[in-house]
């Protein structure tokens, strides 16, 4: 997989893959600006996702929706834990062994968790579509078991295709300042790197289509419902539309730009198909869009809040507990077990 932000052979130069052409690159932006941006994401994401994990693991896994959300929280938190290594490496604050660790472990983990999050977002979208068309259907034990098995399969599949990227990053750097991860990969490691890139592209575009198709159908269904009931003035149309566009906005902002830039950038790392100027441009585009994918870990908690009643009620209960311990037991029970007809909102 691509390696986030680790791309130099020395302070300001690199060699094009397969050639001995020296390519000068200005790293001031990646050494100063991006470490600051990732530091902001790290603290914001660590706080919000730790809180989200605490809340979700107080909620019983009584629906496919909750199961998928819990997996997303774990994935986001793992991604966030890779940020400090990237920050130190990009800012040139770590020694050579740290940069090798980034190439071999933490950058691979970053992409591993990214595509797990994308996969579960696709499953959540399908679940929301089914919930909209069949709002009163509850999850049976067999459905819950199927959701758990599917979750394990996703984690196992991504781990199996990611592990070789760690193992095949096994060349010793000739220079202590070498941080371009492609130089640390074996010949087959470069081939596998490219193969996994295309696999991940397929994963993304499948889930992209799922999000577009399902939410188009959801919007159509909600509009029909609105037309049927608009006389009663009970349908919060504007609120529902906001919920629809939260998912689409997050997907477009965080993931689409990076996946348009990823294939040409990977080719620039593994093949001599671009000149120096193009390689530098692709590098800056990749770094910028990669930061947007990292932003997803901070935006997902907002999705949990708007889509999941159990999460929203538990958060409200937790906030009330900070002001009044006398009502904590009642609020917690309401948040987790709820007397509402559904534990989550359809959208």
From Swiss-Prot:
The chain crosses the membrane at residues 34-56, 68-88, 104-124, 149-168, 192-213, 240-265, 285-304. It is found in: Cell membrane. Gene3D superfamilies: Rhodopsin 7-helix transmembrane proteins (1.20.1070.10). Its main location: membrane. ADP binds at residues 99, 103, 111, 162-165, 181-185, 193, 197, 262-265, 269, 286. Pfam families: 7tm_1 (PF00001). GO terms for biological process: adenylate cyclase-inhibiting G protein-coupled receptor signaling pathway; adenylate cyclase-modulating G protein-coupled receptor signaling pathway; cellular response to ATP; establishment of localization in cell; monoatomic ion transport; platelet activation; platelet aggregation; positive regulation of monoatomic ion transport. GO terms for cellular component: cell body membrane; cell projection membrane; membrane; plasma membrane. It is a multi-pass membrane protein. Disruption phenotype: Mice are viable and fertile, but display impaired blood coagulation, due to defects in platelet aggregation and thrombus formation. Glycans are attached at residues 7, 12. GO terms for molecular function: G protein-coupled adenosine receptor activity; G protein-coupled ADP receptor activity. Residues 1-33, 89-103, 169-191, 266-284 are extracellular. Disulfide bonds join 23-276, 103-181. The modification Phosphoserine is found at residues 61, 63. Residues 321-347 are annotated as: Disordered. Residues 57-67, 125-148, 214-239, 305-347 are cytoplasmic. Keywords: Blood coagulation, Cell membrane, Disulfide bond, G-protein coupled receptor, Glycoprotein, Hemostasis, Membrane, Phosphoprotein, Receptor, Transducer, Transmembrane, Transmembrane helix. InterPro entries: GPCR_Rhodpsn, GPCR_Rhodpsn_7TM, P2Y12_rcpt. PANTHER family: P2Y PURINOCEPTOR 12 (PTHR24233:SF0), P2Y PURINOCEPTOR-RELATED G-PROTEIN COUPLED RECEPTOR (PTHR24233). The transmembrane domain is composed of seven transmembrane helices; most of these are not strictly perpendicular to the plane of the membrane, but are tilted and/or kinked. Agonist binding promotes a conformation change in the extracellular loops that leads to an inward movement of the transmembrane helices. Antagonists can bind to an overlapping site, but block the inward movement of the transmembrane helices. Belongs to the G-protein coupled receptor 1 family. Receptor for ADP and ATP coupled to G-proteins that inhibit the adenylyl cyclase second messenger system. Required for normal platelet aggregation and blood coagulation. This is P2Y purinoceptor 12. It comes from Mus musculus (Mouse). The lineage of its organism: Eukaryota, Metazoa, Chordata, Craniata, Vertebrata.
